[in-house]
């Protein structure tokens, strides 16, 4: 058996790999007015360009999975490395989704810093389809690199902030398993808009059929998959979630086997999180790291940007570059509302009607507002969470409405080629680093955009999705010149892993 106390374990906001053949007929995305969420929502098939990119990503995921499977023939002797391999195998395994068509890795590939790998989706829908192709999340994929280093969610009374957890809304607290990243890994498999399984037991059953079963049992014990599966398990696990209201655990297991399935599911998540914490993912190999170690130097523009980052622009207040005894993670793991506009490109706004399976992802339709951490802290939500929470946090909900976890800036510019589009912020509203810095600089300087204003992002900004608890002290009126904005972007680009210092 394994003790993970001293491991840095992590997992991503995982979603999924797509099956191109089924997408061409069924995958829809919302197209909305660029300035009015109240406008009529229509549906459209994904573009040929998006489908082509998806096929390329699928091919790469299959290649990586095949290489990982080959490593089963010559296992590393180190048990931590075995756990990392097991986690990688599950992360790239599309069989762990309801329609056997999505791997967690579909939204988290190395070439993009372990976030969304489809440029056309980042440019258009921002969020990614689930195993049920017509279902999209309300948020863009987070990077799972460096997520292992987030602490268990706790309240810091000195700064009046919640700190830690995983997910944009911090709901993977880490209070049950001792690690937020492992608990985060347990979310997507049974999320109806992600991997879509109706029961955690389905994930365990599917894993028991995979080539890595022997490795799993070697690490976690022979009892891991020693369950008496019902005859209809294949049929039950092929029905997309959510499960019927009267049968929240549709796989019929004995109490003993249900407990065993829960333990094994935890171990699956811990293994995935172990891979996310490995040096393959959480690397610290950027130019910034090389400068810290004396192996490289900033350019004049990068150095100026770093000074602005730590000074006039106040970026370092939340995206901390570390202090005594701290790793430079470029996040403080708190939450903030910077006033990001709603992203009308999200297909989630169109998911108000029952789909072909009767599921309604977004009853609020175009009136949906993402209230982030505040929604997580409501009493009803807290009581529904599998991870223990402090009920005293309910009173913190008003002060956390619309606040979103501060992401790391590491790898924000990592991309497979220069023209590749990345989506930024929790809803993917921004698609360039320059636009983000300009927003921080001018949010409260430029006027509000009028409907169909062609100057959006240049001469005006849309209203925030929610103005509750909006950060007004460090965002909105920074007084930066255009050249200073460019310098900050130049510095942030030094945070991309994979830098090779000149000899």
Residue ranges and their predicted role:
Residues 37-503:
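Periplasmic c-type cytochrome electron-transfer domains
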Residues 4-24:
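Bacterial N-terminal signal peptides that target proteins for export
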Residues 22-33:
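Bacterial N-terminal signal peptides
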């Amino acid at each position: 058996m394994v003790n993970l106390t001293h491991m840095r374990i992590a997992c991503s906001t995982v979603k999924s790999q797509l099956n191109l053949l089924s997408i061409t007929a069924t995958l829809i995305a919302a197209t909305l007015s660029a300035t009015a969420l109240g406008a009529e929502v229509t549906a459209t098939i994904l573009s040929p360009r998006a489908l082509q990119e998806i096929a390329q990503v699928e091919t790469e995921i299959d290649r990586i999975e095949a290489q990982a499977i080959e490593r089963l023939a010559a296992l590393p002797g180190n048990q931590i490395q075995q756990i990392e391999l097991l986690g990688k195998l599950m992360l790239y395994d599309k069989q762990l989704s309801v329609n056997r068509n999505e791997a967690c890795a579909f939204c988290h590939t190395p070439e993009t810093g372990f976030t969304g790998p489809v440029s056309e989706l980042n440019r258009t829908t921002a969020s990614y389809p689930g195993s049920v192709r017509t279902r999209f999340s309300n948020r863009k994929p987070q990077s799972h690199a460096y997520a292992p280093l987030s602490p268990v969610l706790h309240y810091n009374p000195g700064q009046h902030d919640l700190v830690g957890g995983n997910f944009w809304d911090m709901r993977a607290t880490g209070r049950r398993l001792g690690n937020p990243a492992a608990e985060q890994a347990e979310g997507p498999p049974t999320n109806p808009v992600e991997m879509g399984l109706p029961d955690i037991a389905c994930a365990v059953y599917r894993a028991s059929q995979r080539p890595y079963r022997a490795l799993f049992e070697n690490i976690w014990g022979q009892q891991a998959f020693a369950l008496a599966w019902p005859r209809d398990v294949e049929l039950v696990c092929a029905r997309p979630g959510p499960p019927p209201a009267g049968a929240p655990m549709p796989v019929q297991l004995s109490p003993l086997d249900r407990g065993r399935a829960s333990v094994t599911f935890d171990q699956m998540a811990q293994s995935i999180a172990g891979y996310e914490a490995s040096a393959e993912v959480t690397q610290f190999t950027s130019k910034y790291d090389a400068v810290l170690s004396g192996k490289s130097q900033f350019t004049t523009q990068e150095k100026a940007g770093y000074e602005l980052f730590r000074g006039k622009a106040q970026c370092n207040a939340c995206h901390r570059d570390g202090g005594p005894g701290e790793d430079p993670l470029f996040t403080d793991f708190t939450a903030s509302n910077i006033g990001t506009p709603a992203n009308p490109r999200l297909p989630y706004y169109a998911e108000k009607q029952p789909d072909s399976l009767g599921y309604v992802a977004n009853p609020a339709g175009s009136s949906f507002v993402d209230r982030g951490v505040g929604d997580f802290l409501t009493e009803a939500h807290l009581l529904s969470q599998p991870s223990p929470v402090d009920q005293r946090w309910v009173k913190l909900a008003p002060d956390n409405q619309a606040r979103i976890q501060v992401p790391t800036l590491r790898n924000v510019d990592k991309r497979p080629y220069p023209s590749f589009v990345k989506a930024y912020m929790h809803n993917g509203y921004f698609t360039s680093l320059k636009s983000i810095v300009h927003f921080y600089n001018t949010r409260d300087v430029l006027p509000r955009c009028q409907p169909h204003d062609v100057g959006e992002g240049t001469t005006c900004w849309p209203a925030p999705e929610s103005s509750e608890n909006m950060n007004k002290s460090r965002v909105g009126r920074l007084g930066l010149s255009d050249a200073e904005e460019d310098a900050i972007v130049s510095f942030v680009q030094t945070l991309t892993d994979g830098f090779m210092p000149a000899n």
